[in-house]
């Protein structure tokens, strides 16, 4: 289904800052420990130390997906001039499975925002088939849109995000 103006990805400016509008085509379930990520959920760095379990829907295990995890609010939400920071990149994930069955191109690096409340965005793309994806030379100033264009991934088929701030930070994101 197409995203409405009230969709949390639109309200949270994930669509716009990181992604172009897209239609959700498969389910994406992201779990840290026993907490399932819902759009806008607040998580602390201590809760996201280890990579999450990611489950992908779909009905044909011959379809493959690429998962990208980025922070668009680097170094701070008020001055994101290093947008985006790549935290994780997994390719060749078969439908109906999860990240454990994919190819980890860039290993998971847990979010540790230095200041402010950062959005951590997980984006799922459907691949045209198995393909070789090269790790970028650096994690800073990664661009999800350019990455999708280079590897002919098209628009996302699912996405989710959570908010993360310093362990002793306070307050919530204002939208």
From Swiss-Prot:
Entry's Gene Ontology BP terms: meristem determinacy; positive regulation of flower development
Compartments, record wording: Cytoplasm
Keyword field: Cytoplasm
Keyword Nuclease found: no
Pfam family, one: PBP
Stored Gene3D superfamilies: PEBP-like
Alphabetical list of InterPro entries matching this protein: PEBP, PEBP-like_sf, PEBP_euk, Phosphatidylethanolamine-bd_CS
Keyword Cytoplasm: yes
Primary location: cytoplasm
Example of a GO cellular component annotation carried by this entry: cytoplasm
Main function: May form complexes with phosphorylated ligands by interfering with kinases and their effectors.
Similarity-based family: Belongs to the phosphatidylethanolamine-binding protein family.
The name this protein goes by in its record: Protein TWIN SISTER of FT
Organism: Arabidopsis thaliana (Mouse-ear cress)
Annotated gene: TSF
